[in-house]
């Protein structure tokens, strides 16, 4: 069971009334049946209840903004919302893997799992077939998180406090040419293993597939954020870290700089 369809009805209702720029969320219970959980002498053991959070995004990213007149919502916007929720709950994003997912709900989907294998949810582009059946003419982006499992996950997290760094973070971008089957999660993993102390965040801000690229290739534009809590990083340190990350991406994924 899923929360998806109730939210899609609201998307359709609002879109037909010219309120097409959608940002919805809903909490609700979902019920699943698994015959493998059936136990002799225990009634209803094969049924389970899961409290979930659903997120729906559709339409333009910015309402009537002259500076961004045609900026549509995207799966990257939805992913940012999901990541912000996880961060606010205290989940370490470096231990979260966004992997490719194939199912009937999404035309392009991602599973959201921890490095230990716990599935926290799914997200992606809702199948056009489903949208058509509900008379929805625009792309809809949807994420569903298991609040039940998230609460179990954050119970394991130790809450720590530290002074905000007085020293600035540094951002460096790489435009990478990669095989189409390479996932962003692989880039995150390799980069984190390359620099555990000073690499604070990694963000994918552009994906390109099409003209002027070799067959079977895609381009990822990735930002790397570096920061030392005790001092300002100099160019020599930054260049050394980025060179190490770049070399490891080349050796392990066959990545090339564009």
Label each region the model flagged.
Residues 1-258:
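Extended beta-strand-rich architecture
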């Amino acid at each position: 069971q899923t929360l998806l369809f109730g939210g899609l009805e609201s998307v359709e209702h609002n879109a037909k009334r010219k309120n097409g720029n959608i940002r919805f969320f809903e909490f609700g219970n979902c019920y699943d049946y698994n015959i493998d959980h059936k136990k002799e002498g225990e009634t209803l053991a094969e049924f389970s209840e899961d409290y979930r959070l659903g997120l729906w995004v559709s339409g333009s990213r910015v309402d009537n903004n002259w500076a961004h007149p045609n900026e549509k919502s995207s799966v990257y916007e939805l992913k940012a919302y999901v990541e912000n929720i996880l961060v606010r709950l205290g989940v370490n994003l470096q231990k979260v893997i966004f992997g490719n997912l194939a199912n009937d709900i999404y035309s392009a989907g991602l599973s959201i799992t921890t490095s230990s294998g716990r599935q926290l949810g799914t997200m992606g582009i809702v199948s056009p077939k489903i949208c058509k059946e509900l008379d929805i003419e625009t792309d809809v982006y949807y994420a569903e998180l298991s609040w039940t499992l998230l609460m179990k996950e954050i119970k394991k997290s130790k809450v720590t406090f530290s002074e905000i760094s007085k020293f600035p973070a540094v951002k460096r971008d790489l435009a990478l040419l990669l095989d189409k089957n390479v996932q962003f999660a692989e880039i995150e993993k390799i980069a984190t293993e390359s620099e555990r102390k000073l690499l604070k965040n990694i963000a994918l801000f552009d994906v390109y597939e099409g003209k002027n690229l070799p067959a079977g290739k895609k381009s990822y534009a990735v930002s790397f954020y570096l920061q030392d809590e005790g001092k300002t990083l100099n160019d020599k340190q930054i260049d050394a870290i980025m060179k190490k990350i770049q070399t490891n991406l080349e050796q392990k994924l066959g990545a090339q700089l564009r």
